[in-house]
């Protein structure tokens, strides 16, 4: 892992939008040693290398100025850019020419704060070691080395949708005090390498950074074409769907109070999505089997050329993390209390924010991870055309997934309400 500061090179930086505001009062946070150097990490993929470099540069720049007292409309249009042109610039680790852009830096800084994520922890979790690829996702999907964050490669249309809804999303997060089942959006970036633009969206991982998921479902409340393919089912951890959930007689066993709180939160979130005419979202359900999870696993032999943390991101064995509270940052997962090791099925609720443990006396000892995903699809002309085509194919009364936002929400809530025992 290489580390250095930016050398004299053709590096141009620009910030669009308002300058820094005044300091503002926020909750007490642990103190960190601010790193003055921008770290550069070796990454097999130039795109990932530039992304890591860009995030480190961005967080370092933000750390030099206090957060604004309040966000202004211009903050939701702002961006910061940097362009590097030098064939000697970190040539072992990075391409010689690249551009990096962060969208709405002050807005996402504020969102990270509201979600209880310190900027230095965010930086460490993303960049201490390169992220790993996760299989079986639409588009490119990366998981941070400590498994607390996911980096999803999205389209320029997704970025445009995020931009148009970001102000509403931020207002909603303020209103609900960050207590939501919606994705926690933490950063939005564009990376340009070899004249090709890639767009990256960083979110909190809905699954645990330490409890492996043994089964997962993507639930929409539709029964047409909602069964995992044979190709999907043979994967180590297939993404199962609505029909699979029903066919397996799967149920979620949580206490009545937890169920009440969850459904209230879900209804509130779905009402927000309906207001924005958003649909086609899913409930992502991950299930950790506590008995299975407490069984010792065979350790794989370590190769001589492996680094200290090899960044493997299979869903079956997260790396061990050392707790550190108050000095050098250990990343988002580094808050684990070192004086009390977590037992089987235990989790820190402020890290694994989507987790709910099964009720006492439930037939299965499990931990459930439940959150809303794919919330960027708005009901537009393309959706209307798809709905018309599916109606012709399946009939007007069929349980097809492409319907109006209000219909989608009602069907979705009806289905999810019935997944509980």
From Swiss-Prot:
One of its GO terms (biological process) is 1-phosphatidyl-1D-myo-inositol 4,5-bisphosphate biosynthetic process. This is Phosphatidylinositol 5-phosphate 4-kinase type-2 gamma. It holds the Pfam family PIP5K. PANTHER family: PHOSPHATIDYLINOSITOL 5-PHOSPHATE 4-KINASE TYPE-2 GAMMA, PHOSPHATIDYLINOSITOL-4-PHOSPHATE 5-KINASE. The modification Phosphoserine is found at residues 26, 349. It catalyses: a 1,2-diacyl-sn-glycero-3-phospho-(1D-myo-inositol-5-phosphate) + ATP = a 1,2-diacyl-sn-glycero-3-phospho-(1D-myo-inositol-4,5-bisphosphate) + ADP + H(+); 1,2-dihexadecanoyl-sn-glycero-3-phospho-(1D-myo-inositol-5-phosphate) + ATP = 1,2-dihexadecanoyl-sn-glycero-3-phospho-(1D-myo-inositol-4,5-bisphosphate) + ADP + H(+); 1,2-dihexadecanoyl-sn-glycero-3-phospho-(1D-myo-inositol-5-phosphate) + GTP = 1,2-dihexadecanoyl-sn-glycero-3-phospho-(1D-myo-inositol-4,5-bisphosphate) + GDP + H(+). Its EC number is 2.7.1.149. Interacts with PIP5K1A; the interaction inhibits PIP5K1A kinase activity. It comes from Homo sapiens. The keyword Magnesium does not apply. One of its GO terms (molecular function) is ATP binding. Phosphorylated, phosphorylation is induced by EGF. Coiled coil: none annotated. It is found in: Endoplasmic reticulum; Cytoplasm.
